[in-house]
Regions:
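Active-site rim/loop-helix segments in enzyme catalytic domains that contact anionic ligands
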Residues: 1-96, 220, 229-233
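Metal-dependent de-N-acetylase/amidase catalytic core
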Residues: 2-7, 83-234
Length: 234
């Protein structure tokens, strides 16, 4: 199993694309191996089916150039801190040995998103403990850093990543989720089918404007960032 440089976790397929699809495309262009892990099958989604979501997720991953997409089967609306979930997530981390991990920020209107971030953070810690036994019985692995992306929230980020050249890929990856973002005659009314992609574009535009770029994605970190570049640009 080839190790990943970046592994991004989401509660549901489309979470990662909403929060950091542009960043994924950017790092893939740089030669990084990037993976996505969907914790649930989104079986309680108002629109679409488990089968259609899987096909849409596959298409979105191809648009972004993702190396692998992992599907866990934790319960939708049941992402709580428990041994089984921790062992499954820690097993994924140990199997793919990423340098960086991303997960949803805890402040979000959907409880599953915040719970997913907490679960992944706890599992990442456990994955580094040699005596902790995960679901796949893999050796311990310690990640370098963990960062949090935003899904529904629009919070003050700790840092942003310029995605001006990758914004079209991000939007294309979201359009792959026709069942979620495109209103049809049979759609259940949700915030996602009422201009949600336009909201995402506006948010990334606002983050970009703060750093004189067309578009940027915002991230939260619990640790200080070490700046290697000269602040004076030398």
């Amino acid at each position: 199993m080839k190790r990943l440089d970046i592994l991004a976790f989401g509660a549901h397929s489309d979470d990662v694309e909403i929060g950091m699809g542009g960043t994924i495309a950017k790092y893939v262009k740089k030669g990084a191996r990037v993976g996505i892990c969907d914790l649930t099958q989104a079986e309680l989604s108002s629109n679409g089916t488990v089968e259609s979501r899987k096909e849409e997720a596959k298409a979105a991953a191809a648009i972004l150039g993702v190396s692998t997409r992992i599907q866990l089967t934790l319960p939708d609306r049941g992402l709580y801190l428990n041994d089984e979930a921790m062992k499954d997530i820690a097993g994924v981390i140990r199997t793919y040995k990423p340098k960086l991990i991303f997960a949803p920020h805890h402040q979000d209107r959907h409880p599953d998103h915040g719970h997913a971030g907490t679960l992944v953070e706890e599992a990442a810690f456990s994955a580094g403990i040699h005596k902790f036994e995960d679901s796949y019985k893999q050796p311990a692995h310690k990640i370098s850093e963990m960062y949090y992306y935003m899904i529904n929230g629009h919070h003050r980020p700790d840092f942003v990543i310029d995605i001006s050249e990758e914004m079209h890929q991000k939007i294309d990856s979201l359009h792959a989720y026709q069942s979620q973002f495109v209103k049809s005659a049979h759609s259940v009314e949700t915030p996602l089918v009422n201009g949600y992609i336009d909201y995402v574009k506006t948010r990334e535009s606002m983050y970009g404007r703060e750093v004189n770029k067309a578009y940027a994605e915002g991230f939260i970190t619990k640790k200080p960032l070490l700046i290697d570049d000269d602040l004076l640009g030398g």
